């Protein structure tokens, strides 16, 4: 999914949905880091992608709180 489409999708969601999505993304990041530490992770670029998605979600949550 393209970044701009993903951000627009995030902006359309409620804060509660974003919070739930943030928790899921953080759990995924934890699992990816664990897999990477045990040399089971094939696609290490996924860690960077998930980190960026977490930042995008947090940015949208902050913007909605400021409104």
Curated annotation (Swiss-Prot):
Family: Belongs to the universal ribosomal protein uL29 family.
The protein, known as: Large ribosomal subunit protein uL29
Alphabetically ordered keywords of this record: Ribonucleoprotein, Ribosomal protein
Record carries keyword Aminoacyl-tRNA synthetase: no
Matching SUPFAM superfamilies: Ribosomal protein L29 (L29p)
CDD domains noted in UniProt: Ribosomal_L29_HIP
This protein's GO CC annotations: cytosolic large ribosomal subunit
